[in-house]
Curated annotation (Swiss-Prot):
CDD domains: RPA2_OBF_family
Taxonomic lineage of the native organism: Archaea, Methanobacteriati, Methanobacteriota, Methanomada group, Methanococci
Transmembrane segments: none
Protein name: Uncharacterized protein MJ0818
InterPro entries for this protein: Ada-like_dom_sf, NA-bd_OB-fold, NA-bd_OB_tRNA, UCP021980_OB-fold
Pfam families: tRNA_anti-codon
Entry GO MF terms: nucleic acid binding
Entry superkingdom: Archaea
Length: 203
């Protein structure tokens, strides 16, 4: 092949692309650990902080079946963490793999590119390896509802629970609106108070 200025230029560009690609493969860009107050859009960072809030979807028995957003705080500010598709499914599996599940107060690490969405900074997880529990702080037990009738029940629209099948107030509840608890402690932990009639009549 005759060496011309054009051929030499193309050859040089090809070599540059190959060398650059190889270098990036062998030396991937490393994220920089920062405080939330220091980040800006486009930064590739590692953030460590406490879970402040989790936006989850639960089924009728209170099992978590989806996670839409996690808000973390490191003492300098808040950051939203989101995931989509397969990564969201893997995030849910990871969170539920702990007993009790990962929840508010737990100390975590996230890694990713900072984006801006509706005026808020967020990191979109591209890989479940970019989300890690560093320390479990919240050991409050996970509370679920019973799928079968128990002696402890309430309306899903109220805040009083009943323990007697003869309770005149409990009898007014429509079957489709009744939820059942495994224990009175579960009912109280979810913010329910015992019905006065059941309390007075030993139910």
């Amino acid at each position: 092949m005759k060496l011309t200025e054009k051929n030499i230029t193309l050859f040089a560009l090809t070599c540059f692309v190959i060398i650059s690609t190889t270098w990036l493969f062998l030396n991937p860009i490393q994220p920089k650990e920062k405080h939330i107050a220091e980040i800006k859009e486009g930064d590739y960072v590692v953030i460590k902080g406490y879970i402040q809030e989790m936006y989850v979807k639960r089924d009728k028995y209170r099992h978590v079946i989806n996670i839409s957003r996690i808000v973390i705080n490191d003492g300098t500010g808040n950051l939203d963490v989101v995931a989509f598709g397969k990564t969201r499914e893997e995030l849910l599996t990871y969170i539920l793999s702990y007993n009790p599940m990962i929840k508010e107060g737990d100390y975590i690490e996230v890694k990713g590119r900072v984006t801006l969405y509706k005026g808020k900074y967020e990191i979109i997880l591209n890989n479940i390896k970019d989300f890690k529990l560093l320390k479990k702080n919240n050991f409050e037990r996970d509370i679920y509802l019973s799928p079968t009738p128990t002696g402890i029940y309430a309306s899903k629209y109220g805040k009083k629970y009943h323990t007697s099948k003869n309770c005149p107030y409990g009898k007014r509840l429509k079957e489709e609106n009744i939820i059942y608890f495994y224990s009175e402690d579960d009912a109280k932990a979810l913010g329910y108070e015992k019905c006065k009639w059941c309390e007075e009549h030993g139910g």
